[in-house]
Amino acid sequence: MSSDAEMAVFGEAAPYLRKSEKERIEAQNKPFDAKSSVFVVDAKESYVKATVQSREGGKVTAKTEGGATVTVKEDQVFSMNPPKYDKIEDMAMMTHLHEPAVLYNLKERYAAWMIYTYSGLFCVTVNPYKWLPVYNPEVVAAYRGKKRQEAPPHIFSISDNAYQFMLTDRENQSILITGESGAGKTVNTKRVIQYFATIAVTGDKKKEEAPSGKMQGTLEDQIISANPLLEAFGNAKTVRNDNSSRFGKFIRIHFGATGKLASADIETYLLEKSRVTFQLKAERSYHIFYQVMSNKKPELIEMLLITTNPYDFAYVSQGEITVPSIDDQEELMATDTAVDILGFTADEKVAIYKLTGAVMHYGNMKFKQKQREEQAEPDGTEVADKAAYLTSLNSADLLKALCYPRVKVGNEYVTKGQTVQQVYNSVGALAKAMYEKMFLWMVTRINQQLDTKQPRQYFIGVLDIAGFEIFDFNTLEQLCINFTNEKLQQFFNHHMFVLEQEEYKKEGIEWEFIDFGMDLAACIELIEKPMGIFSILEEECMFPKATDTSFKNKLYEQHLGKSNNFQKPKPAKGKAEAHFSLVHYAGTVDYNIIGWLDKNKDPLNETVVGLYQKSGLKTLAFLFSGGQAAEAEGGGGKKGGKKKGSSFQTVSALFRENLNKLMTNLKSTHPHFVRCLIPNETKTPGAMEHELVLHQLRCNGVLEGIRICRKGFPSRILYADFKQRYKVLNASAIPEGQFIDSKKASEKLLGSIDIDHTQYKFGHTKVFFKAGLLGTLEEMRDEKLAQLITRTQAVCRGYLMRVEFRKMMERRESIFCIQYNVRAFMNVKHWPWMKLYFKIKPLLKSAETEKEMATMKEDFEKAKEDLAKSEAKRKELEEKMVALMQEKNDLQLQVQAEADGLADAEERCDQLIKTKIQLEAKIKELTERAEDEEEINAELTAKKRKLEDECSELKKDIDDLELTLAKVEKEKHATENKVKNLTEEMAGLDENIVKLTKEKKALQEAHQQTLDDLQAEEDKVNTLTKAKTKLEQQVDDLEGSLEQEKKLRMDLERAKRKLEGDLKLAQESTMDIENDKQQLDEKLKKKEFEMSNLQSKIEDEQALGMQLQKKIKELQARIEELEEEIEAERASRAKAEKQRSDLSRELEEISERLEEAGGATSAQIEMNKKREAEFQKMRRDLEEATLQHEATAAALRKKHADSVAELGEQIDNLQRVKQKLEKEKSELKMEIDDLASNMETVSKAKGNLEKMCRTLEDQLSEVKTKEEEQQRLINELSAQKARLHTESGEFSRQLDEKDAMVSQLSRGKQAFTQQIEELKRQLEEESKAKNALAHALQSARHDCDLLREQYEEEQEAKAELQRAMSKANSEVAQWRTKYETDAIQRTEELEEAKKKLAQRLQDAEEHVEAVNSKCASLEKTKQRLQNEVEDLMIDVERSNAACAALDKKQRNFDKVLAEWKQKYEETQAELEASQKESRSLSTELFKVKNAYEESLDQLETLKRENKNLQQEISDLTEQIAEGGKHIHELEKIKKQIDQEKSELQASLEEAEASLEHEEGKILRIQLELNQVKSEIDRKIAEKDEEIDQLKRNHLRVVESMQSTLDAEIRSRNDALRIKKKMEGDLNEMEIQLNHANRQAAEAIRNLRNTQGMLKDTQLHLDDALRGQDDLKEQLAMVERRANLMQAEIEELRASLEQTERSRRVAEQELLDASERVQLLHTQNTSLINTKKKLETDISQIQGEMEDIVQEARNAEEKAKKAITDAAMMAEELKKEQDTSAHLERMKKNMEQTVKDLQHRLDEAEQLALKGGKKQIQKLEARVRELENEVENEQKRNIEAVKGLRKHERRVKELTYQTEEDRKNVLRLQDLVDKLQTKVKAYKRQAEEAEEQSNVNLAKFRKIQHELEEAEERADIAESQVNKLRVKSREVHTKVISEE
């Protein structure tokens, strides 16, 4: 603890930081009883102090401070710490650590206004709610450079520690200031910034003064000034905090290498922009709005057109408008000053204020609803004018854009109407977006200003983010804020608890993992993981029809009841509605989801945004321009630039992305935590609510942090660093002169120090210390250093004084000697003998002196020579040193060049990779285009086939028409007069037909235009295909016509003069042909242009591929160069190494010589000392030379050592560079391999593109060929046109002759004019009816077809003409309009149209052939079309000679038309009859309706029965599921089986075959059911035909209606009988179901019994055979059941036929109902059969599984036995091998013995010569015995080898058997899987049956709807019949009157 004098440096802040010395002494002397002083649990205060009075039976009686006596349990009593721990600064040091101790320590310190307290590794601060003098400048200075334990707890201490760690550890730091809203985070953030700006000042001004005289400060001033500006625009009053940050910020302060301030930047997160337009009652909006209205700067009031009353503005007056603790006027001046200091220009400053005022005015804009409309309109323009003025917009444009925004629909913009509420929502969204973008832009500008471009090394990040919030109304913003705090708390927990303990385990420290219960992963995953809240929110935003309700329902479906953190809130009175609750670490929060989808999508009025982009206010235009997004994100904004257009990024997605970036930044730094606490909810200074603080302590992990700090080892240091730093504590513990490991040295060092050895642990790389021990070691080190320095100073001073004393003594002795000698000399100098001595002495020694002088001169010359040599060698060494330095520099330059080359290579690699990515994208695009083209080609092929089918049908129709025309030709002569009278009438009818045709053509063109919008290329192809089809149709028509024209040629010669008027028509047709030719030319040019573009693209791709290949070659060459350079580097390095060794050797030699020279010089000095006084001068010279020589030698040695060390370092550096280069080389090789593989891919893609190119070129050549052929045909047509022009002259003369006939026909024309007009009116009415009721027109045509069939030939002719007219309308429209007076003109027009269509046919074939070139399968069709074109050209030539025959054909047409009119009149009469029929039908329909209602009742009954059946099906499905569970249990048992006998394979295969047979039967049954369904469908179609027959025979139906009713009654009775039968069937099915349930229960019991028996029973192969017999029996049973099913199907068929007979008589609706009943019955029967099959299969599978399990058990036992046998065999084998080895050794010994005996035998033979025959015989007998023994041993050895081989074979057989058993088990596994798959298939069949019943219900509804439509059609037909009857009567009357 520091003394009061030491605390004086803190000034007036000292009492608020640390207890005084007096208080500490009083606390130590205070009486304290450790046993009785306790904390006890209290209901109100959580914990109170108390004194224990007694303890009995687990109960404690205590007296509290308030005097109350309480009795509590033992576990509710907590010991109190001694008084010396009162107000302790680090709570981790307390003896008793628990919640009440921490709480009361914080409370007592807070009562003494000591708001900062350490809690282990982090700092806790409590909000004082008043100003304290603890942030003064003297406090900043006092904390600078202080260690944590040297100064009181403070935010400045945390900041300084982070700063010092940054400098010493060279690591980025971060300070995380966290806590709930209102805890004081913002104030502490400002103090941290103030501290860094003070202690790390740069010392120079960024800008002394701007050119305009604008005020700007230093970097530290600007960093400090950023806070007032951001607070003005980003802070607001909330319920819990008067200055709450409504955005998060991460401030990075960058420092240089020396620790000086370099720059800073700010990243912001999640600005709460909804506060701009809405505030709660107890809150207010952002401070800036109230500052500008404070009237501190009146010029702002005038400039912004506002008042000083906040209630005049709706957006800022919804809550409170004043805050007692904030002076808005002073804050305005601070904000204004901060804007100036931060370097905003004058225009930018004005723009900021203007946009703020515009937001306020936006809230006052009024809108109202137009009368009788929902459209909104402005309610006054005054406010809009102000807002538009401030934003430099046009007021009218702004209002128009708000009320009538333009939205993009497809490729066009349309104006959209807005309701009043929509306009208000749009205005609010624009205001919020404007404010948010302005805020993010300000952050970007601040970052630009704080970026000084100075070099920066490290940074310290300060995080201040919105605290945890629990309001009455919590929305999306609160969820994001709370989620951020959840992530930060998880980061804190992970850093403090998990990582700390994992570090212990990794370092090998004995540590029991402590679960501190702070894992927040569940809540975090609930919010951010897939299918979490954010994921579901973003998914809902993608759906256009999603609502808040659908979002809520999805949340409930996904998480309610599945996650403990997700709850459904309970409705509370007086609170806002809540939709879901989340359990956060700080509490449970209720969230309201209204408007979340719109908030997340963040929609804006794009029309207004467009106005903003064109605004005269540059800042506003920039905010909404496209470039703002990037800058905003660069400025660190949360939502600074949403991605529009290319991607849809929601607010939540952007928020999560920025949050993940923040967490990544934090994880890369060393964090320091500051936990801010709220003492009370009332903002009362000095008061502390226990429960509130305890809740925060628990949630923030404060207690857990203290616990782990005390239990763990928070301080750690590397062994080497510890050894180096703390060796001074006991240097003797580490032996000198020998190597010792740093870890061992640290262990010895700590073991020799007097500390608690339980307070530290040794890890693998570090030594770990408990809290406080490292500080103790630091103190001991400081004391030891002080002792060592003091002792060293004393030793040095003593040595210096002793040296001085010796010098004094030597001087004293010398003085005494001199005095003595002088006195003696003075006494004897006058003696005579002395005088004689003085004269003779020099003469005696002169000769000797001369000799000595000569010797000394020689020595001196030698010394000079040695010195010269030394100087020469030194110079030589210096030159070598210079050369080495030069080589070193060269090497460094080479290394630098290689590094540059590598950097270039990396850049090129990056470029190649980018190019590769681009190529891959292009390849992908081309592939997609090719696929699209193939799809289009396939569609065209299908359409072409369809058109060919239509062509064949049209040909048949034309053949019928030709037959009709031939018949009409016979009657032509009898009806010529009628033709003349009806010619004019026909012309009028033709005009009406033309009108109808035009209308149809207009509809077709509109439809065609829509198709063009969808796909232009496909439309072109479709258009040409349609033209081709129509041309083919016309060609077929004309082919038939030409055959008739040949016969009529002679008759038409008499009517040639009538054709003269056709000349003009021919000319017009020629012009049409020319126009068509031009259009085709343009299309051809367009296609050529597209082909050229495609060709250019292909060439570009080829060029790009060549460039890539070239770049790859360059890279390969560069890599080879690099390899050569590396080899050269190695050679140069080897050379340098060699030179270094040479230099080392030379330097060693020089050193030896210098030492020798030094020795000689020292000897010379000793000799010189003995010289006489007269040689002193010579001696001094020699001494100086010697000293100089020694100095030179020492300098050379030092220089040599330095050079050697430097060269060693250089070599090491070069070695590292070499390793790095080799590593980079390997990386480059890998990259080159990757590039090579990529190039192969690109080359393949290029080859594919080249193939496509060649294909396209072939197609182009074919198209050009076709074009040339078409040009030739056009030339031929032009020649034909010229011939026709010549003939037209003759026709003109004939036309004059026909004029007379025209005058005669005109009178008849006037007679029929009125009739034509009436027909026109009738046709117009019919066309309107056709457009309004398309289905009615179709019905009328169908009725006409029926009438045509009744009247046979007459009606058939009419229908043929109508069909020909409807199919040819689109192409014949032009020549029909030119028909005016006579039939000759029509014939000529047909001729011209034929030519025109021929040319169009050629064009169409051109395109068809282009398509066919892409599709080889259509080649035959192409050839056929070419042949048709050639035939058509021949026909055209023939038609030139057959023009005369056209007259006869025209008369045939006239006759046909006359007959059509006659048939028309007959049709009118028929329609009158049909009217009667319709009346009778209406009567019949009424009766049928009654029957239908009755059938509906029956249907309801059937529905109920169906529902019961569905319930039974669900029960069956559940039983199947239970069976599946049992199967799953069997599977688990089966997985334990490892072996199986191979004999089971045959039985299993037979079982599988039987199952497949069963499946085949099931498939056959399903096929039969499908056939039954198809039969029903066919019968339905027959019923439709029968209904048509009823309409045709309506008269007979009227007569037999009574019988029909009787039949209907009978059918009803039949239906009732069927119903009863079905009820009986249902009862039977219920009985069967119960029986099946019993069987299932029995099967389950059997299964359980079987499982019990499996443990005791072991069956063999006989069981498998019995299982096979059982399978056969089951198969027979299944077959019998299949037969039964077949019988039931037959019964069903019989019932179906009976039902069909009844339906033939009944009406369609009753028929459908009966059909549905039958189908339901069939399906239910099939479901019951399916159920039976499933039960059979389940029982069968269970039986099979029993057999399988039994056999598997047997196999397992046998396998175990085989394994045991194998083990025994292996042991025997090992024994045999040992025996064999032993025998082998014996054999070798025997052989050695034989050799020895042989040797002895030789010796014996020698002895035999001496010893006799007996000895020889004995030896020979012994030899024979030994040989026999050897042979026996060899035999045994051979037998042993045989036995060994036999055992090895046996082991192999067992191994093979084991392998076979394993394979059998695998086969069993596969079989079981197949059986399980079949069970699943049966389940699916049951589900499909249920779906089929639903489909039948849908069919019934559809048929009911068709009945209603049929009734409508009948009504329409009746009305049309009435109209036609009236019209026919009128026409008939007129015709009779005129005749």
From Swiss-Prot:
Residues that bear Phosphothreonine: 64, 69, 391, 419, 776, 1241, 1255, 1265, 1286, 1467, 1501, 1517, 1730, 1736
Alphabetical keyword list: Actin-binding, ATP-binding, Calmodulin-binding, Coiled coil, Cytoplasm, Methylation, Motor protein, Muscle protein, Myosin, Nucleotide-binding, Phosphoprotein, Thick filament
Q: What is its main location?
A: cytoplasm
Q: Keyword check for Phosphoprotein, yes or no.
A: yes
GO molecular function terms listed in the Swiss-Prot or TrEMBL record: actin filament binding; ATP binding; calmodulin binding; double-stranded RNA binding; microfilament motor activity
Q: Where is the Myosin motor domain?
A: 86-782
Q: Which PROSITE patterns match?
A: IQ, MYOSIN_MOTOR, SH3_LIKE
Where does the source fall among the domains of life?
Eukaryota
Query: Which residues fall in a coiled-coil region?
Result: 843-1939
Point out residues bearing the modification Phosphoserine. 36, 79, 392, 625, 1092, 1096, 1162, 1237, 1243, 1261, 1278, 1288, 1292, 1303, 1306, 1413, 1474, 1495, 1514, 1542, 1547, 1554, 1574, 1600, 1603, 1714, 1726, 1739
Function of the molecule: Muscle contraction.
State the protein's name.
Myosin-4
Q: Which organism is it from?
A: Rattus norvegicus (Rat)
